[in-house]
Curated annotation (Swiss-Prot):
Keywords: Glycoprotein, Secreted, Signal
Family: Belongs to the LEG1 family.
InterPro entries named among the record's database cross-references: Leg1
Naturally occurring in which organism (per UniProt): Dictyostelium discoideum
Gene Ontology cellular-component annotations: extracellular space
Signal peptide: 1-22
Protein name (database record): Protein LEG1 homolog
Localization terms from the record: Secreted
UniProt-annotated glycosylation sites, renumbered to this chain: 58, 85, 165, 226, 245
Amino acid sequence: MKSNKTIFLILLFLINFNSIYSFNFKKEIKISNDKINLPTYNPWIFQDRFNLYSILINSTNIPVFGEDNSNNCLHGLQLQFEWQNRSGRLEINQGHVNTKSWWGDMNYYLSIIPYLSAMKMGLVPVVEIVSINDQRFCSTYEDCDQEVLNNWDNFFQQIINIRNNGSEGDDQQLLKFMWTAHIGSIDKATKLFTDSLLLLPKNELRFGNGWAHFVDVIATVNFNTNYSTVYHLGQQLPPIMLNSNDTHPSSIESFTKEQRNVVLTMYEINDLSSNNLVWNSFMYLLKKMTKNEICRNLINNEINIFLNSPVPTIIEILFDILTNNC
């Protein structure tokens, strides 16, 4: 009897032990497996970062972007990244983007940050982003700058709202949210990566800084960064990095006339932006004038003409519009 009672108590203990502990054990295994099975992307491998762009673009298609999604304003980010690679600006070695590349560093805030935001909003698949030992390159939503993320959250929320409402969407409204997020990313990245900017050759630095400020100009007029527009622009951009001898773009024989004009324009914008008072006054006037629809369309038209067939006098043209025509 005593033996049977002992066996019974042992069995009862084992049953209770199993019910109490095995569930938690299985849960731990499940969580562990989920983490193991997450697709992993290394943002410092060019193809991985490029693929994240593709996922992001394909996952944000809405009617206003067209049946082929070519009007999606996120195409511009991927096409720019492709140009940066093609022109050697990512300083790729065996498929890896150089972590000291200013262009690659800046692009991180226009690729990984938007993806983490879209992932948080449930628009794209959950993935694991490989991190490096540098806190400037956050790899989880929680670790990233919340103000920068909030701007992207607002943009992606617009896409979610359009889908939920079953409407086509307003591309101008979407562009406003996209540009707010875009400028927020650039402003944050510009402050973080002055060290890698200073590693660039003098004239590449002038070009890069001018380019970053030119984005402020095209954002003001709600420029559409869809596939066809940015693809065409990519043909006008310098195909290689600039060196210390490229002070005068007209002397760069391997560049087309349009490419020389783009470089010259970015040099001018760099020089203009070096004087904060002058640049801030210019941007203030530009933003003020673009509130007028006629002025905004006029300025937008000139910028589109420039991007399709660059001329070396776009800044003078804009100043003329701002001071005389509006």
